[in-house]
Regions:
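Alpha-helical transmembrane segments of multi-pass membrane proteins
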Residues: 1-413, 418-429, 444-717
């Protein structure tokens, strides 16, 4: 998202400076529109071929620095061209020499309106019923229709008519020969080089792929391996199931939160009269398991003892009264906000109230038998310390993956080889891997003591829903592992203190203001440009805060998050519309104060939502408040865009295209800064509270700059 915004800003800015010197603007607009459509083909092809082009072996993860550079490469053409198209549209609507802010604002409104419709149609229709290249072809068709309409308007321009006709002919040739499906299959095959892809689907939550090698089926979700059948990882499934269940005398009810199919449920079915509740958010994922005629999957998912729920795990637990003897959390580490919710203090408290007196909660974290790096120790200690703040007893079985056992009763005495074997024999459970020798190795007291000693001197923050420290530690761990050069700089972020960050933020604002002044040498332009950047940044920070908060409270509910983004865009339209209607009466100083006060109200409402999130009635009301807040936040950028254009046009010798390109570019630049700072630094390290502080600083400095500009302009007169 951040890279899309910065590249679009570059496209808007560069074209804004050059467009006045281009004679045939309609022709260039049509060419750009066609190139924009073609750029999607290039981007999708690059996404699926980039590893082969860079000679990166299949299955090898990429570091943060390489991901950053690759996303710039993939998004380069569509983003740059899209930014350029905005400036072109604004210029084409202007007559020669005309400086009409209303027409510029209409371009902004219609572009945002298109984004809303595009987002809703993509989320609710396209992603469900069409492949990626079919979607690309649909976009191509819509753009060609626009070009045809333009060519009829400018029927005398033979170049426009010729290019449109040729492009239309080539497009329909591609459709006639069904090349979109051919390209789809070829690019998927390239991406999964060396494996036979037998199933490929995009659900509203995940990209689901099944490959086949000899007689083995491999399941992938978002390119990450899920499991393989029929040759399952016996060691893993037997450890995480039978070690905890050997402790429980008569287990009756089990809860699986994700990743239960492909071995876990199969082992649980060995226990008599065991009732299993299996929670999986993505229904399409389980439907995929059922489609493939694999014995172990049919046995697991068709068993009478297994109840399937297509829900968010956190939501499910909040709304049931059942007590469980065993809870298995299938996520291996809190690598993002969606998964992090299952490792927070708040969630552990809910879990504690949902397990029986001798109940056990099990999850796993990355580990090592021989060496724990500082970053790996931080990740483990963060989650384990958080669990220890809730559960009376937390035991760790260290290994290549650490098995964490949480309970309200002391189970340490039962974590001995003879006790585990005795418990399994009493329940008539047959196992393949968990023999006495292996258990002596896995439950070795010296290794457990060594692991605990490694964590003793590690200082970490606890993991909360609204302060997701574990997400940062996870990113830090993988950055150290995959991007050692970039890690040297990234690691310094976590050492930042709040006061230090505020100091750096103020210094950055001062430097930014000086840079703007050097380029513009106009006090009005300086304040207007800074306000465009700060408002773009504030809008993005608030929008991310809403999305993060919604995820924390309600999970990764794709439809609702798409709605949040759409309502944010709707707010931009309403803001721009109101500004156009009252262009003469609105003052920038008043708007900045208004935005500042609304930001304070925003966070007060968000705090209220957080404090009352456990109230069952309000829990169903709050999503509507989120939508209202999204409209409010979106209106910030929308309402200031026409005002800033009006001010700069009146106080600048620059042509109108240059002004429009600059304001749009600086608004997007602010959005880019907000996306990077909010998602990587502020939210995971300091929490939502500090996003509020950052917004207050940005808007107060805007007011100070506006006041100084006003004083300076009066003295000049």
């Amino acid at each position: 998202l951040g890279n899309w915004l910065i590249l679009e800003a570059i496209g808007s800015y560069l074209v804004g400076k050059k467009i006045e010197y281009i004679k045939d603007k309609i022709l260039n607009f049509v060419v750009l529109q066609i190139l924009f459509s073609l750029s999607f083909f290039i981007s999708v092809w690059l996404t699926r071929s980039i590893k082969l082009l860079l000679k990166i072996p299949f299955g090898v993860s990429l570091g943060v620095d390489l991901i950053f550079l690759i996303t710039i490469l993939i998004l380069f053409f569509p983003s740059i061209i899209h930014g350029a198209l905005f400036t072109y549209s604004a210029k084409i609507l202007q007559q020669d020499g005309e400086k009409n802010v209303v027409k510029i604002s209409k371009v902004y409104i219609f572009e945002t309106l298109g984004t809303i419709f595009g987002g809703i149609i993509f989320t609710y229709i396209l992603i469900k019923f069409f492949s990626i290249f079919q979607i690309v072809f649909i976009i191509f068709l819509l753009n060609i229709l626009c070009c045809i309409a333009l060519s009829f308007i400018n029927i005398k321009n033979k170049k426009v008519l010729g290019i449109t006709t040729l492009t239309s002919f080539l497009f329909f040739v591609l459709i006639f020969f069904n090349l979109q499906n051919y390209i789809e299959k070829k690019t998927i095959s390239k991406f999964w080089s060396g494996q036979e892809v037998i199933y490929y689907k995009n659900s509203i939550y995940n990209n689901i792929v099944v490959t086949k090698q000899n007689q083995q089926y491999n399941f992938f979700v978002n390119s990450y391996p899920l499991f393989s059948v029929p040759y399952i990882d016996k060691m893993f499934v037997e450890e995480v199931v039978h070690i905890p269940l050997s402790i429980i005398k008569k287990p009756k009810r089990v809860l699986i939160l994700g990743k239960g199919a492909g071995g876990i449920i199969n082992e649980l079915l060995k226990y008599e009269n065991l009732s299993i509740d299996y929670i999986e958010l993505d229904k399409d994922l389980l439907e995929t398991f059922k489609i493939l005629s694999v014995d172990i999957l049919k046995k697991e998912l068709n068993s009478r003892n297994v109840s399937l729920y297509y829900l968010d795990g956190c939501y499910f637990l909040k709304n049931i009264e059942t007590k469980y003897d065993f809870v298995f959390i299938g996520f291996s580490e809190p690598k993002d906000l969606q998964i992090n919710r299952f490792f927070t203090l708040e969630f552990f408290k809910i879990l504690k109230s949902k397990i029986s007196d001798e109940g056990v909660v099990t999850f796993q974290l990355p580990g090592s038998y021989v060496y724990l790096s500082k970053q790996l120790a931080e990740l483990n200690k963060c989650v384990i310390s958080t669990a220890k703040n809730v559960f009376k007893f937390v035991n760790v079985l260290p290994g290549d993956y650490n098995i964490i056992l949480c309970s309200n009763s002391d189970i340490t005495i039962h974590l001995a080889p003879e006790k585990v074997i005795s418990g399994l024999k009493e329940k008539n459970i047959l196992v393949d891997v968990l023999n006495e020798k292996y258990l002596e190795y896995r439950l070795n007291k010296e290794k457990i003591n060594w692991f605990n000693h490694q964590l003793e001197d590690t200082n970490v923050k606890l993991n909360y829903s609204f302060l997701p420290s574990a997400v940062f530690y996870s990113i830090n761990y993988w950055t150290a592992k995959l991007s050692p050069k970039f890690f040297k700089y990234f690691n310094k972020i976590q050492t930042l203190k709040e006061k230090t960050f505020v100091f750096y933020l103020l210094i950055s604002i001062l430097i930014l203001t000086m840079i703007i002044f050097l380029f513009t040498k106009n006090s009005t332009a300086v304040s207007s440009t800074y306000i465009a950047i700060s408002t773009g940044c504030v809008s993005m920070l608030l929008n991310l805060t809403l999305i993060f908060s919604f995820q924390v409270l309600y999970g990764y509910i794709y439809y609702q998050i798409a709605l949040l983004s759409s309502f944010f865009m709707l707010g931009s339209i309403l803001g721009a519309y109101l500004a156009v209607k009252h262009l003469r009466n609105l003052k920038l100083m008043g708007l900045e104060i208004f935005i500042l006060l609304l930001s304070v109200l925003f966070f007060l409402l968000l705090k209220t939502i957080k404090d009352f999130s456990n109230n069952k009635i309000l829990y169903f009301v709050f999503p509507y408040i989120f939508l209202i807040l999204s409209v409010l936040v979106g209106s910030f950028s929308g309402i200031e865009f026409p005002i800033l254009n009006k001010i700069l046009i009146e106080n600048s010798a620059s042509n109108i295209s240059s002004v429009v390109g600059k304001i749009y570019a600086f608004d997007l630049l602010g959005g880019w800064l907000g996306a990077i700072l909010g998602s990587i630094v502020i939210f995971p390290i300091f929490g939502i509270k500090f996003i509020f502080y950052a917004i207050i600083i940005l808007k107060i400095t805007s007011l100070i700059l506006l006041s100084l500009t006003s004083i300076y302009e009066r003295q000049r007169i």
